[in-house]
């Protein structure tokens, strides 16, 4: 049996399904099962958006549980995660998103509000990190 990163994620989810996996700063806890359900929903979104193996998906927000879940969903789908520090200025974030050709952008609300959307021909889809 080949063991790799995804194997360990799947294995951990299966054996710890009901146990806490992630807790946010407000104290809301997600079990491994919750994480698996969120990942599955994001996989459906990626599929409906036409995302294929190797396509880039950018993430830019403060640390939060949804960031971690989105990151795991991207990797387990076979897409390429493009993590962007939320401390970057809006023009730098736009440049990274444009240069990477990210097809989807997960963005925290404060970051999304600062970006000039018309200067980003891609991404095709933007998801507010707090909303999924």
Which positions does each model-derived feature cover?
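A short N-terminal helical cap/helix-turn-helix that marks the beginning
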Residues: 1-21
């Amino acid at each position: 049996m080949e063991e790799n990163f995804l194997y360990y994620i799947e294995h951990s989810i299966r054996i710890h399904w009901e146990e806490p996996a992630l807790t946010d700063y407000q104290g809301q806890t997600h079990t491994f099962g919750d994480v698996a359900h969120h990942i599955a929903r994001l996989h459906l979104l990626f599929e409906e958006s036409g995302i294929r193996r190797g396509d880039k998906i950018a993430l830019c927000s403060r640390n939060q549980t949804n960031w971690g879940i989105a990151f795991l969903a991207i990797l387990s789908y076979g897409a390429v995660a493009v993590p962007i520090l939320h401390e970057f200025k809006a023009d730098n974030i736009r440049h990274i998103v444009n240069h990477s050709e990210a097809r989807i952008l997960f963005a925290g609300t404060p970051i999304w509000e600062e970006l000039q959307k018309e200067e980003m021909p891609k991404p095709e889809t933007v998801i507010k990190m707090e909303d999924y």
